[in-house]
Amino acid sequence: LSGRAHREHRSARRRTTPHPSRRGRARAVRALSVATTAAALALGGLAGPSAAPAAAATTPYPNLTPTPPMGWNNWSYYGCDISEETVLANARALVSSGLAAKGYDTVTTDDCWMTHSRDADGNLVPDPTRFPHGMAYVGEQLHAMGLKFGIYEDAGTATCGGYPGSYGHMKQDADLFAKWKVDYLKLDGCNVPVPTGQSADDVYHKLYGDMSQALLDTGRPIVYSVSAPAYFEGEKDWHHVISWSAEVGNLWREGADVAMESSSARGKWASIKYNYAYNVPLADLQSPGRWNDPDFLLAGQSRLTGDEIRSQMSLWSVMAAPLISSTDLTKASPEALAVLGNKDVIAVDQDTKGLQGRIVQQGDGYDVLSKPLADGDRAVALFNSSDEARTITTTAAKAGLPAGSSYLLKDLWSKRTTQTTGTIAANVPAHATVLYRVHAGAAHRVQPATAITWTRTGGEGATSTWKVALADNGPTGLTGAQLRINAPEGWRLSTSKVSLGKVRPGGSATATLTAKGPDAKPGTTVTTLTATARYRAGGAGDGSVSGRASIVTEVPYPSLDAAFNNVGVTNEAAPPAEGNYTTGNFDGGGDSYSAQALAAAGVTPGAKVSKDGVTWTFPAAKPGTPNNVELAGQSITLTGSGSKLWFLGAEAGFASGQVKVTYTDGTTSTGSLGFPNWCCTAGTEYGATTVATSDHRNTPTGPANFGTGYKLFGNSVPLTAGKTIRTVTLPDADAIHVFAITVQ
């Protein structure tokens, strides 16, 4: 997961120039030049840090959050499209849905709530259009609902959205927030000047320490969320920044943001996995009352499955992460509200022992996590991060439970309790997590823990052979076990019903079958087979268990054009004109290349585009229609031979991945492919070269960022000389976009 793109998710709305995104933060910190620093200080009339910054505040911040904070924040769903009514409507939904009563009690307004300049006295000014009654009024309304009032600012000269930052105004802003009766401050870290001779670590420490002391000096208890570590993610000083964040604040954002609402389904799931992956190893840097924050919960947003939102809720709770929803709660589905409001899962997160769970077992595509709970139980999560269903098996001993002969497993999603002698196992669908609360002990008339495991034993093409096993992991044997197999329409099974008879405690029974499906379409097709076993378990009565198998079929696309899945170029015309600027989404934030700006650079639909002797044909697709591939491991049919395979593309992030070339003789070769971000980079990252530069881009509200170059790049991977290409398999890296491929 470390190579996944840091996607640009900051909205471009209401901007005239781009600003550093909240993803890829460390790059932005390191790239800030002395000239930029000096210009920012002069322009803002601010006093910058001295050559040797004074020591940061050493008074430890009080423990205002004995359990992880819970609440709602607008950013991931609304971005800058916020208003007083939007915030208060979601607050009312927190109350009416019952989520507030379950702990979601803090409502935070993120970036873009203020005007672009301070008043004559240097105070922040709420945007009179978005917040006509002011921010104090918002706080009053929230408090009247029994909720807490959260607000956003930035430690730099400007927020990530380009609004006034708290740099040079820490005490003034803290006093203003206290006057408004703010209960929670999220302090971001965009646009922090780092003068020559100083380390970014020291500068950030000083600034965040200054705000910490300023908040203390107000006398008002304000929960302090520190974003500094996110700007050092993966850097050598990352852990050190987290360590001092735990001294100056209550919680800290330590890495990339989760995806925005406009992101693709793959982008959202990838961001959940990415944020989980950087957060889960940080348990040693967390302590009760000091929380690692891997960002918002996405339940209620579009394009995520029920399994995916339950996975995020499960993993965040086991990691003792803040539970902060970012969605439109006024329109959230019953399923999303049930996920956010699951009392048993919330109890795992809010457990008073206050410890982050850890990985106790890993395998190909899965993790097992265990979290100690205050009453001696353990929360055990079986996380299937892969794209295929699988049975995950561990033991009570590996999960850290005391030795014993019996354990009770409560599935916190199905609410079913079973009994095991020590094995903890479940068939887990793709992208899903089974979350158990495990108690050392026994109970009468409780169903034994059972699990179904599918094992593929052979087959090719559309035909596969399988062994299906029913395991009894409990103290009670099974009788009359019957197995039923279901397949999608168009599939044929050699058998759909098998009698398994008796299964002894600790034993298993198996069946074999053959499945044959129709020819798959180009791309990746996932077919699910389901086995359901029904049985009687002595005095515990009748029971059942189900398990899935995934059949993944990869069929190459006949051409790159046939794989196009992203609208990267739009017209500058307003809706409802064909191909208008609202129809694109190159970067996950609704932004796209301007067809007119590209045309001015010589790039038009179907045109030949050349650089350094390499020529591509730009897609002939009309603006507003798919014209590039957002990479997801697609396989493309291609023919030709040469020394290099050249790609025309760009990125909405910073990522690279392996291209696999398969030749007609069955051999393969590989090469690494990456492009610079489409904007605001040196243009030579990953060995790429700039092919064309457009003067501006389109945003969801129209053309913007004039004078800023949005580029297309060329890059290549080597080919084996003398061999003919049959297929090209692209990387699984959704930040990378490819418009054309040619052989040289």
What do these predicted ranges mean?
Residues 316-319, 324-326, 362-401:
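Carbohydrate-binding surface patches
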